[in-house]
């Protein structure tokens, strides 16, 4: 018996070594590469790249090789450096032919990030639905949590750990009335008081139909969002940006990236393909353009999108990154 245990132990160790050796080799031979900070400038019509050299000196240049000072970059990226330009009294009256103020810029600026580790992390299946039309200025966390079951939605009072039957029936009936099929297969919300307003959740039902769910004055608000013919959504993201222009984002089964407008209409973006389970996505948005950084396990791709119709303005590829698979 002891001999068998030793043999089993050594076999297990050997299997683990074979499994881990490729990763260990990749990790030990990894050469760290810092991706330069890259932003699209609608003022310049090109990407502005900021990078440290071997002597730790900053270089600022565009894709054509033209170099710039920090003060010039401030003016080329007024949405990013709005505070600096305002402090220096250099903020322009117009940008790209449009009259703007620092307040306009700050209202429409936003950042968004999606990483595979968050997408692939185990989900508890418990959510918090805030009151979206509170009489108070500040948002407040609810006293209950909810979950989706095969038959409906259940609200659980956290103090007593008991199901609120009346509220559960109220919300379940409304969801069924709007055509929702239980159970839900994906839900995205942002239950925090550190935001300007609450839009509840974007939810995919058992048939991958898209719904908007929130609580307004204690009652359910449910809206079925119409999808283009043949589109099967797989991931949704609630946004809740200050401008209130968008409700969220959606990625379909073919990895197409859609913008969900505040009225529920969908616009397909020019991004060529994004798999949230494998790729990292970062968006720096303003009222003129979006700088979208799509990172795979090896490469970085930058896309400049028009902030009006999300069409492609310019793209840039950085094929040089070496990192362990996330």
What are these regions (language model features)?
Residues 216-217, 263:
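Short loop/turn segments that connect beta-strands within beta-propeller blades
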Residues 316-325:
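Residue-level detector of conserved catalytic or cofactor/ligand-binding positions
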Residues 6-25:
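Hydrophobic membrane-insertion alpha-helices, especially the h-region
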Residues 45-113, 132-156, 192-205, 211-212, ...:
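Short beta-strand elements that form the blades of beta-propeller/WD-repeat-like
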Residues 167, 255, 259-264:
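C-terminal luminal/periplasmic domains and tails of membrane-associated envelope-modifying transferases
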Residues 124-136, 180-191, 230-240, 272-289:
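Repeated scaffold domains used in trafficking and secretory/extracellular systems
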Residues 24-48:
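Alpha-helical transmembrane signal-anchor/signal-peptide segments
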Residues 164-175, 221-229, 267-274, 315:
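Beta-propeller fold detector
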